[in-house]
Amino acid sequence: VLDFFPDLLPSPPCANMEKLTVRHMLCMGTGQEEEPDIRQTREWRKNFLASYIPHEPGSLFHYNSMATYMLSAVVQKVTGQRVLDYLRPRLFEPLGIDAPDLHWEQSPEGIDCGGWGLFLRTEDIAKMGQFLLQKGEWEGKQLLMPDWIQKAGSAQIDNSLNAGWLDWYQGYGYQFWMCSQEGVFRGDGAKGQYCVVMPKQDMVVAMTAGLSNMNLNLEAIWDCLLPGVQDEALCDEEAEQAVLKKLQSLQIPLVKGEKAGPSVALWNNHTYAVGENAMGIDRLSFAMEENGVVL
């Protein structure tokens, strides 16, 4: 990894940092016991490269979103493009993921955050899962090598020491978690954003949620959905139509009320000074817009 950023290296770098590879970061095997807080300054890459790695890379699993940020930085360094812009013609557009609000949060360095901050619709997540299920093929075109998807969706590092729920210590691939159900793997995000790929069942489940207990989502799939899966298609047209009608009726109504209360005048278009802090932020401003608030 150091070879990609020779101008950002500390002197001297940590010995284990010198051994760190892209593969180690893909499978969360940096050798770090904690995710380094690289966001203390605006130079995230430099802070990561200066962080300490106590264990041999590849010997210890620890979930590390900052490592995924560095993967994004590597892609930008090699291609000269943001990950979002690199993927648009190669992945997003072929899959029909072309929402005008497709967005990826960036660091102060102008690099897509990688490990978080990608805004997608639930339908887009489902398309990504179907793409993985089809081993990188979409509408007759092979967009990604099947061998890569096979490796990404298979255990590349042991995470059995990872405390917590059952589905969090079944192994980890290239940015994908292995699940307790045979052959199933998933991408997941904070508070229950899921893309669950089930090759044996030829099925994908996409979820967006806001839960503190992310395990509830998976338990619902294992306990309620999988037992009802059959190899044959529904032969009862009336039952099929009933299912479709039920699905179309499931929605969360919009919250009623005004977009902003009377207190908006107290903070809208105001700037506030901020005391000394680790993030180096010295002021904040708020601006009310049509669809939300800009900070």
Indicate where each model-derived feature is located.
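Alpha-helical scaffold elements that line and support the substrate/ligand-binding pocket
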Residues: M25, H62-F92, G96, D124-K135, ...
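Active-site Gly/Thr loop motif
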Residues: A99-D101, Q150-M207
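N-terminal glycine/threonine-rich, aromatic-flanked beta-hairpin/loop signature
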Residues: N277-L295
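Active-site helix/loop module of the DD-peptidase/beta-lactamase fold
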Residues: V1-M28, A50, T79-G115
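Short, gly/Ser/Thr-rich active-site loops of penicillin-recognizing serine hydrolases
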Residues: N215-D282
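Active-site-proximal binding-pocket segments
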Residues: P94-G153
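Flexible glycine/proline-enriched surface loops and loop-helix/loop-strand junctions
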Residues: Y52-P57, A67-Y69, Q106-G114, S180-V184
